[in-house]
Amino acid sequence: MDRKIEAVIFDWAGTTVDYGCFAPVQAFSEVFKEFGVTPTMEEVRKPMGMLKIDHIRTMLSMDRIQQCWQEKYDRPSNEEDVQKMYAVYEAKLLSVLDQYADPKPYVLEAVKELRLKGIKIGSTTGYTDKMMTIVTKCAEENGYRPDVWFSPDSVELKGRPYPYMVFKNMQELEVTSVANVVKVGDTISDIKEGKNAGVLSIGVIEGSSELGLSEEEYEALSQDEKDSLCKKVRTSFLEAGADAVILNMSELNEYIRKVEAR
């Protein structure tokens, strides 16, 4: 019997909006610098997709960052530091989020086609409800509005890689089986969230946090450079357990057609 996909659950920043996932990245970098530690882009992006306060905890647990912290403060970082950093981070992010809610290329077209097939649109995020109030409003003004969204606030702060936000989507959308759900994201924690939920977990390359480039930077690359970077991101997603990897949202509906025809 042919499979029928009932719902596609998208991530937000780096997946459906905010090409390159720059809003949170910029804020994390600035916060750590303010506290006297300059992180690399790799260190900032590695935990992307997690609940934002967990992201700060994860960065502080990285060997090099912790070493820099102890050199500056003569002690290890603690939870009080995490809370102070998060307060600064949240204020920074909330002040710029409205500038990072434009839908990525092919997103609106892909969502329209999904809806024409009767497929429901869900979403999960590493943002909090407070942050999402801004993002969802601006995204809707720009033409993107999923049927539902859930943040870690809705699952007792057990965000990615826990699967619970996916399950909340399924419950709200009245989906009958995890076998009929596709999760699409742009980070390793997105992939793990999908796998832990038992749904089909898809990575998207262009405009992803994993790729880490603005649209202008990406388009300025030669085809060979694009191919090389995309291959690296594809490998990262597959090694994390992705069921498939798409270049951009223009490939999503074709993937779903193939899944349903198996």
What are these regions (language model features)?
Residues R3-L108, K112-K117, T133:
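N-terminal helical cap/lid subdomain that shapes the substrate entry/recognition surface
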Residues M1-E6, L108-K112, T128-R262:
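Asp-based, Mg2+/Mn2+-dependent phosphohydrolase catalytic module
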